[in-house]
């Protein structure tokens, strides 16, 4: 008896989508996914359109032909198919990570173009075990958040859900399913290239590991992650726990912080460092422990710079402070019709007809701007503006947001951006992200 498409896919609610993107490389995992998904969608009264998307990474001479063969197979079975190519220059280092980033960028764009609410991938139980072993080797200890491995659901770019419905299905079960259906697959030779981390783990430690034991460790790590997340969600429900000013400086109540467990404290302060620095990831385990020790008074320094964030310990009941350090702040062009993220902290939309440059103001030009506009801002507020975006027009400082009653160009809108959540949000962290956004908000207020 084969695998049950209904049991596999029903929990994901795919039926509410207009279209579903299936990521299909031509390997056994993705082809198994495709045909099981096709069978499931055929059971729905009003099924979404199924679109198979093959990403040609242009890393092997055979890849174009393999993508073409996937298209022929899809045509034979009445499945829409398209090929997207990664045509960018390939990096000398970190190729696998760069390819993964490019792949998801292309898949998200395909989903948006098709109005698809879901991207579905063929990650299997074997991949889950390998992911755990890879992350455990990197972290060196058993309490790392990443040991919860891959979430069955994630949200990409705030708009498209990534579903991994096969995380409890083995690769062999999928191959047996394809064999039963008479469908052949391609074995990508890069999957056996031990120059890459995953094949090295797959052919080494994963081949020798007790799979059931690893899955139990994943469940334990997931439970620990949920406990720390839940502690932060509960703390954030109290408005006194965390505050933020217009420019994004955050104020963490020292007593609330001290009342948390060490693991929850490390998560909380690491998360705020990532938000303040505009980063997509948490600081490493060691850095999070270092921040927690400093804020808890176990280490002497009263301030640290981590991940682009300046963190200051509050004394005598004062709140701990997190803000962007004044280094490596970008300059970006904002043209009509554009939507861009500045420094991982602010999102700009330009529906007007004028072009601007977004950059932090220089100290003297900010002083002159404030003087010419008749404003008197205290020193601490002025420092906040120096790490905030301003608009330049024709090379001249033209608009400074967050000032009371400040003029602002027609059609330009700014809101807060959370890089750590807004690009890839694992399902493990859905509730935590909602709690952070509810407390900090997206709207940008004024500095008075």
UniProtKB/Swiss-Prot annotation:
A Gene Ontology term for the protein's cellular component: cytoplasm
Alphabetical list of Gene3D superfamilies matching this protein: HUPs (3.40.50.620)
Binding annotation for ATP: 25-30
Domains: entry comment: The N-terminal region contains the highly conserved SGGXDS motif, predicted to be a P-loop motif involved in ATP binding.
Highest rank taxon of the organism: Bacteria
Listed InterPro entries: Rossmann-like_a/b/a_fold, TilS/TtcA_N, tRNA_Ile_lys_synt, tRNA_Ile_lys_synt_N
Main subcellular localisation: cytoplasm
Biological function: Ligates lysine onto the cytidine present at position 34 of the AUA codon-specific tRNA(Ile) that contains the anticodon CAU, in an ATP-dependent manner. Cytidine is converted to lysidine, thus changing the amino acid specificity of the tRNA from methionine to isoleucine.
Protein name stated in the entry: tRNA(Ile)-lysidine synthase
Gene assigned in the entry: tilS
Family that this chain belongs to: Belongs to the tRNA(Ile)-lysidine synthase family.
Major enzyme class: ligase
EC number(s) recorded for this UniProt protein: 6.3.4.19
């Amino acid at each position: 008896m084969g695998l049950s498409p209904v049991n596999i896919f029903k929990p994901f609610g795919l039926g509410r989508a207009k279209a579903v993107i299936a990521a299909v490389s031509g390997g056994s995992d993705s082809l198994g996914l495709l045909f099981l998904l096709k069978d499931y969608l055929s059971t729905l009264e009003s099924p979404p359109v199924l679109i198979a998307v093959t990403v040609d990474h242009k890393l092997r001479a055979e890849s174009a032909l393999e993508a073409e063969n996937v298209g022929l197979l899809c045509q034979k079975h009445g499945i829409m198919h398209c090929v997207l190519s990664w045509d960018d220059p390939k990096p000398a280092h970190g190729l696998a990570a760069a390819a993964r980033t490019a792949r998801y960028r292309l898949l998200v764009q395909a989903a948006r173009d098709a109005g698809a609410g879901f991207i579905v991938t063929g990650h299997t139980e074997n991949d889950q075990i390998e992911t755990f072993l890879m992350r455990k080797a990197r972290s060196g200890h058993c309490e790392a958040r990443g040991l919860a491995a891959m979430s069955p659901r994630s949200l990409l770019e705030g708009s498209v859900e990534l579903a991994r419905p096969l995380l409890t299905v083995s690769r062999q079960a999928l191959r047996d399913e394809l064999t039963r259906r008479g469908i052949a697959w391609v074995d990508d030779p890069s999957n056996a290239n031990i120059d890459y981390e995953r094949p090295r783990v797959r052919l080494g430690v994963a081949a020798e590991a007790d799979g059931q034991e690893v899955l139990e460790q994943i469940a334990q790590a997931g439970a620990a992650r949920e406990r720390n997340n839940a502690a932060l969600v509960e703390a954030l429900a109290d408005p006194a726990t965390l505050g933020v000013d217009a420019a994004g400086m955050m104020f963490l109540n020292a007593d609330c912080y001290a009342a948390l467990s060490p693991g929850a404290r490390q998560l909380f302060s690491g998360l705020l460092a990532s938000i303040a620095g505009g980063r997509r990831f948490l600081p490493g385990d060691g850095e999070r422990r270092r921040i927690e020790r400093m804020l808890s008074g176990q280490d002497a320094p009263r301030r640290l710079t981590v991940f682009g964030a300046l963190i200051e310990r509050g004394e005598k009941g004062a709140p701990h402070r997190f803000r962007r350090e004044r280094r490596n702040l970008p300059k970006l062009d904002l043209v009509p019709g554009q939507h861009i993220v500045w420094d991982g902290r602010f999102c700009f939309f330009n529906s007007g007809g004028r072009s601007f440059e977004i950059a932090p103001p220089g100290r003297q030009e900010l002083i002159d701007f404030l003087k010419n506009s008749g404003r008197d801002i205290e020193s601490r507020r002025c420092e906040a503006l120096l790490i905030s975006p301003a608009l330049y027009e024709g090379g001249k400082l033209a608009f400074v947001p967050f000032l009371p009653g400040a003029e602002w160009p027609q059609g330009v809108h700014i809101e807060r951006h959370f890089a750590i959540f807004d690009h890839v949000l694992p399902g493990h962290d859905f509730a935590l992200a909602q709690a952070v956004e509810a407390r900090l908000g997206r709207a940008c207020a004024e500095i008075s």
